[in-house]
């Protein structure tokens, strides 16, 4: 088990014996001492901020686990239909997304409601390349079509291996900057074919713009 100690600088999580809770090592080879603090209020370094653990992990599990995670769930079917309705100009997307959101707003059900027009609006995310906790290059600032729908997908399916595909589908992956990501061209929307596969099958050609 762990406990938290507060100091003037931050809260540091420690083991029962009083030693700091170490995880991995930073790029300089120094052990990371985790803290929940976010200095800028928006962005974190490798050791800052809360740790994500969406699905229950068995006690004392480390690099491997037999924890079952959903690969495909009913909420995804509803969100797929909602996105299709939006893209084809039909009504009903808001009703479907509201149904999905209701699980997270049981105590305040009125907060779950979202409308078709809201889903068709821009994203709430502040895009831009980040250095030292500040956006130094906003890059492309054009509104994102169906941006709120994109936000809803990110909130509902966080840590479920969806986001890259969503970003490509909404035209964000190859146009927007965020954190340490800068767009590098449309060819990045597909992965390169592994060299071993190309070598074993001379009829295959590498995807464009990959060496």
Describe every region a protein language model picked out.
Residues 18-45, 109-140:
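Surface-exposed intrinsically disordered loops and tails
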Residues 7-73:
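Flexible, polar/acidic helix-loop-strand segments at domain edges
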Residues 8-10, 69-104, 146-156, 161:
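Extended, hydrophobic/aromatic-rich amphipathic alpha-helical segments that build helical scaffolds
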């Amino acid at each position: 088990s762990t406990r938290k100690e507060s100091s003037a600088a931050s809260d540091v999580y420690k083991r029962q014996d009083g030693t700091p809770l170490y995880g991995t090592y930073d790029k300089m080879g120094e052990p990371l001492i985790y803290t929940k603090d976010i200095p800028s209020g928006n962005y974190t370094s490798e050791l800052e901020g809360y740790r994500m653990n969406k699905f229950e992990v068995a006690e004392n599990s480390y690099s491997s686990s037999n924890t079952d995670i959903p690969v495909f769930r009913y909420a995804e079917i509803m969100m797929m239909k909602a996105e299709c309705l939006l893209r084809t100009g039909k009504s009903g997307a808001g009703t479907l997304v509201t149904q999905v959101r209701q699980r997270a707003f049981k105590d305040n059900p009125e907060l779950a409601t979202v409308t078709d027009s809201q889903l068709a609006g821009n994203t709430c995310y502040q895009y831009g390349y980040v250095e030292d906790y500040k956006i130094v290059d906003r890059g492309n600032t054009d509104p994102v079509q169906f941006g709120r729908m994109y936000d809803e997908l990110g909130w509902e399916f966080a840590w479920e291996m969806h986001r890259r595909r969503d970003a490509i589908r909404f035209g964000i992956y190859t146009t927007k900057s965020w954190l340490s990501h800068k767009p590098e061209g449309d060819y990045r929307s597909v992965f390169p074919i592994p060299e071993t596969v190309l070598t074993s099958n001379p009829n295959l050609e590498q995807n464009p713009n990959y060496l």
